[in-house]
């Protein structure tokens, strides 16, 4: 509490950044867990040729809705391969739109992970400068003169590391998880696109049932 105002400002900024990072991390972990269940159900249903519900309330449902929308817009002159490519393209566009929303917050984690140590270093340098100033003012190199500036300098460094380390680890994990989720959805999209392109009657009955 008795630290220099500059060092104290650095500590406050790093503490707020750490709090924001943990908020993003917890929110992403919970959301990714929910989407992972949707991915598994979507991929399993697409593999087995089961009827999928086009619900706008979840990611898998929006992908299915995009696929059904492209399937309805059929052109008698197009081949099955062309129809499949068009249906898959519509579903991939829906997927990419949601993927961009899921990436929200990840750049902030990357920024904090790379910048927090340097922000903490600013506080460290300022605290050491205060220690040298105290030595010059008192003409004394005892521990009681040097310790306050060194202590606040080291504490600023520690807060920078506390903010940066979880941010870097979480960014790497969440980015990897997001890539895996996207690949799983793409696999389901390919299977669903194939079913929609070649098995018209099955999905026509499914649409009628809805």
State where each predicted segment sits.
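Transmembrane alpha-helical segments in integral membrane proteins
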Residues: 21-28, 163-174
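Predominantly long cytosolic amphipathic alpha-helical stalk/bundle segments
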Residues: 33-142, 169-210
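Hydrophobic alpha-helical transmembrane segments of polytopic membrane proteins
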Residues: 153-167
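Residue-level signature of catalytic and energy-coupling elements of molecular machines
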Residues: 4, 22, 55, 64, ...
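Hydrophobic alpha-helical transmembrane segments and adjacent short intramembrane/lumenal linkers
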Residues: 139, 143-153
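Residue-level signal for the membrane-embedded core of alpha-helical transmembrane segments
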Residues: 10-13, 17-20, 116-119, 123-126, ...
């Amino acid at each position: 509490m008795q630290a220099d105002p500059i060092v104290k400002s650095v500590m406050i900024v790093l503490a707020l950044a750490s709090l924001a990072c943990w908020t993003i991390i917890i929110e992403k972990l919970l959301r990714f867990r929910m989407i992972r269940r949707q991915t598994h159900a979507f991929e399993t249903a697409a593999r087995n040729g089961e009827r999928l519900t086009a619900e706008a309330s979840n990611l898998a449902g929006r992908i299915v809705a995009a696929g059904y929308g492209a399937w309805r817009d059929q052109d008698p002159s197009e081949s099955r391969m062309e129809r499949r490519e068009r249906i898959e393209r519509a579903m991939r566009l829906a997927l990419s739109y949601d993927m961009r929303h899921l990436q929200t917050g990840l750049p902030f984690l990357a920024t904090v992970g790379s910048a927090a140590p340097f922000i903490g270093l600013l506080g460290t340098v300022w605290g050491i400068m205060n220690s040298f100033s105290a030595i010059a003012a008192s003409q004394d190199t005892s521990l009681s003169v040097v310790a306050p500036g060194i202590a606040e300098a080291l504490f600023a460094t520690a807060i920078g590391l506390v903010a940066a380390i979880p941010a870097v680890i979480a960014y790497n994990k969440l980015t990897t998880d997001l890539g895996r989720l996207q690949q799983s959805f793409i696999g389901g999209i390919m299977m669903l696109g194939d079913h929609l392109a070649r098995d018209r009657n099955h999905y026509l009955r499914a649409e009628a049932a809805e």
